[in-house]
Amino acid sequence: MAEEIRFFELNTGAKIPSVGLGTWQADPGLVGNAVDAAVKIGYRHIDCAQIYGNEKEIGLVLKKLFDGGVVKREEMFITSKLWCTYHDPQEVPEALNRTLQDLQLDYVDLYLIHWPVSLKKGSTGFKPENILPTDIPSTWKAMESLFDSGKARAIGVSNFSSKKLADLLVVARVPPAVNQVECHPSWQQNVLRDFCKSKGVHLSGYSPLGSPGTTWLTSDVLKNPILGGVAEKLGKTPAQVALRWGLQMGQSVLPKSTHEDRIKQNFDVFNWSIPEDMLSKFSEIGQGRLVRGMSFVHETSPYKSLEELWDGEI
């Protein structure tokens, strides 16, 4: 019998459900139905962010699900993220309060620094003049206060390289519980995964299918012949194999879909596994990062190159 891998334990002792519904690029008007369908299918983990612009709609649906007795608040694991315009320590609690208000919650289970980048307060877009020097230790102190208050049951980071995570661990009183990064068979993050594991930081993978629904990212992750071959042998879809690979590598996965049939398919990853001989073939897959963060790279930015933004993990 395959090991189900329904949860991973965080360094706080809390359990994070291994499959969460991603809501990035989920259009308002569709995201509510997606969350409703996902929870009824069995998802207990919803990945949100203020910058996605859909937390209000998600909040309305969550309230309806809680009020209707479909699921209890304590059975759900809700993540949100601090956007780059709120890195000033005084802005951090305000940002979370706004998210809590929109989601109609008293607390989030996980609150992440979305990017290791500071943008001018109130700015939209990524004009070079909006990119400020970063002070992650100060922002993290404010995050620790949210953890102390109970409004964020766990805190963590997103899009942090091994080096940036190592630097934060040196100064952190409360170590990050999670580093959420792009991760899929065509961007496996082996160096970062090993580092996170060695420090007790859980790796969570966004775009685990390579963002097939986006128009501005060219993604052939699911068309990879190795993935296709394994899927065929196991009688599964390439998407299911990509997700199950993530679970077997020890990371939670956050597939995004607004189609009920795919939301259901993406959850069918528990009662089977990829045999070791097939798993080893994944090391032959060519690697390439899709979400590169070019918007944050400029000669006047703290990051003059992608090399600097990712500290060589590119």
UniProtKB/Swiss-Prot annotation:
Function: Oxidoreductase that may act on a broad range of substrates such as ketosteroids, aldehydes, ketones and sugars.
Active site as annotated: 52
UniProt entry tagged with the keyword Acetylation: yes
UniProt-listed PANTHER family: ALDO/KETO REDUCTASE
Oxidoreductase keyword on record: yes
Descriptive protein name: Aldo-keto reductase family 4 member C10
Family listed: Belongs to the aldo/keto reductase family.
Pfam family, one: Aldo_ket_red
Binding-site list for NADP(+): 23-24, 47, 114, 158-159, 180, 207-213, 256-258, 262-266
Top-level taxon of the source organism: Eukaryota
CDD domains with a match to the protein in the record: AKR_AKR4C1-15 (cd19125)
Enzyme type, top EC level: oxidoreductase
Modified residues (Phosphoserine): 295
Alphabetized UniProt keyword annotations: Acetylation, NADP, Oxidoreductase, Phosphoprotein
GO function terms (MF aspect): oxidoreductase activity
Enzyme Commission number(s): 1.1.1.-
List of residues that carry N-acetylalanine: 2
